[in-house]
């Protein structure tokens, strides 16, 4: 239900956060800031810790300057409109962003445009999310004879069930175009 969004700040219509002040949000369950239409942020200092997304605009998310420290259980900056492919756009013009997201740092279902800014992005569990499975019983020294098929294993290989849900963990993600005009990125 679109009317029951758990967020510290929630608007059914457009929402604008404007000014040079500071805002600290702790959302132990749910989102930090959500607008069901356009979310516009113009300046300010934001510290957001959210179990779900940090900043979300359904129709669009537009940010002009500001300082953002976001730790989120899902996406850090998020714009998504499943009903209209022309919406869900995300625009960033300058600012400083430190984003630690379990999902994508910056995600748009439409176009994503970045015109400058400083970005320090960590997604998933950082380097700890990388795992390597060498396979039990694999002999890296055995290369076989060229031209011959490898011998069949004596025992059937064990299989693991894969999860059907996968979490996207990208720094910048868009289902449409991504345009970057300047800026500094660390991932």
Task: Map each language-model feature to its residues.
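A composition-driven surface/loop motif
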Residues: 1-187
């Amino acid at each position: 239900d679109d009317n029951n969004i758990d967020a510290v700040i929630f608007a059914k219509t457009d929402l604008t956060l404007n000014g040079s002040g500071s805002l600290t949000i702790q959302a132990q369950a749910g989102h930090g800031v959500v607008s069901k239409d356009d979310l516009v942020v113009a300046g300010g200092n934001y510290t957001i810790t959210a179990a779900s997304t940090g900043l979300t605009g359904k129709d669009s998310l537009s940010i002009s300057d500001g300082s953002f420290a976001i730790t989120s259980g899902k996406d850090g900056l998020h714009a998504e409109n499943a009903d209209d492919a022309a919406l869900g756009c995300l625009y960033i013009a300058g600012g400083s962003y430190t984003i630690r997201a379990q999902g994508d740092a910056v995600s748009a279902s439409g176009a994503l445009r970045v015109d400058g800014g400083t970005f320090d992005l960590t997604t998933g569990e950082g380097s700890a999310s990388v795992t390597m499975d060498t396979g039990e019983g694999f002999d890296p020294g055995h290369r076989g004879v060229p031209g011959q098929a490898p011998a069949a294993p004596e025992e059937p290989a064990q299989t693991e069930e894969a999860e059907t849900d996968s979490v996207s963990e990208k720094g910048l993600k868009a289902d449409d175009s991504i345009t970057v005009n300047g800026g500094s990125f660390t991932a």
